[in-house]
Amino acid sequence: ALTNSGLYGYANYFKIEGDSITVSGRGEVGHAIARHCKYVPIVRLLSLVPKHDDDVDFFAYMINATSIYIESTGVPQLTSPQLGAVKVLRPPVSEQKRISSFLLKLDAKIEKEERLILRMEKVKASMLQQLFI
């Protein structure tokens, strides 16, 4: 599983400086994350930089919703040619932004509820421990 959204370490230079999408090439193969920061991609991380004024959040959601056929044996991996062969729709940017805005808000609500559930589970565990000691 990805920790810290796949971020690891620090650098004093950057290879990617604008909005982009990273896609994991190994491990959690094909998992896309929209990036709005400067970074240096390492190991098996594929970086996608839009050629047009597209919404990277929208395309990260689209990639995550797309089945990508992984043909490797042994350790699964995703290569640039495999990812490049995936065809996606490209709606107008205004529609991309509306869709991604809705999905980002939904994800924020889901994360908030997940944090609440974790807190409630800790309270329950604490209460059970106190009840049965």
Regions found by a protein language model. Give the residues of each.
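Amphipathic alpha-helical coiled-coil/heptad-repeat segments
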Residues: 89-133
